[in-house]
A protein has these predicted regions:
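C-terminal segments of enzyme domains that contribute to small-molecule binding surfaces
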Residues: 2-12, 72-78, 82-83, 100, ...
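Solvent-exposed, flexible loop/coil residues
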Residues: 7-10, 17, 47, 68, ...
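Left-handed beta-helix
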Residues: 15, 20-21, 26-27, 32-33, ...
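Active-site cofactor/substrate anionic-group-binding motifs, chiefly glycine-
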Residues: 50
Length: 170
């Protein structure tokens, strides 16, 4: 797993976290317990810190850039090829495949940003809502069953990543 120091700051990855061997993590990054960073993902904290909580999955080919302090909470799923740029993502949120979340945006707890949605700079997404479109707009509230699926998904990624670790695929 390529971890690179930048300006004297080296990434800190919890020993139970999984980082794919071709993911790149640069600078002032912290990755929490049982989280996973999948193939082709780049996490770059060369301007501001990036903090990723526990049981969070950053799926394949994502870009996370700390243009401002970037905080991704616990039990978050960042979908394939999503871009997360200088923002805050609350616990249990989902950022859909190829979605973009711009600088200063705040995604509430258990909110879902739909696939391909674009959350504009400084936008605030309420907790337990689903947003979609370009620009992203609220389309509905999150159901209790959907909230449970998010928790199940985060747990499933944590379990899968441990299988990768057991097979020395990091």
């Amino acid at each position: 797993m390529p971890l690179a120091e930048f300006n004297g700051k080296r990434p800190k990855v919890h020993p139970t976290a999984f980082v794919a061997p071709n993911a790149t993590i640069i600078g002032d990054v912290e990755i929490g317990e049982r989280s996973s960073v999948w193939y082709g993902t780049v996490i770059r904290a060369d301007i501001a810190p990036v903090r990723i909580g526990r049981l969070t999955a950053v799926e394949d080919n994502c870009v996370v850039h700390g243009s401002r302090e970037t905080i991704i909470g616990d039990e978050v799923i960042v979908g394939h090829a999503a871009v997360v740029h200088g923002c805050r993502i609350g616990n249990g949120a989902v950022i859909g495949t190829k979605a973009v979340v711009f600088s200063g945006a705040e995604i509430g707890e258990r909110a879902i940003v739909a696939m391909g949605a674009v959350v504009l700079q400084d936008t605030k997404v309420e907790a337990r809502t689903v947003v979609a479109g370009i620009p992203a707009k609220k389309i509905r509230e999150l159901s209790d069953s959907e909230a449970k699926i998010i928790t199940w998904g985060a747990q499933s990624y944590a379990e899968l990543s441990q299988k990768y670790k057991e097979q020395n695929l990091e």
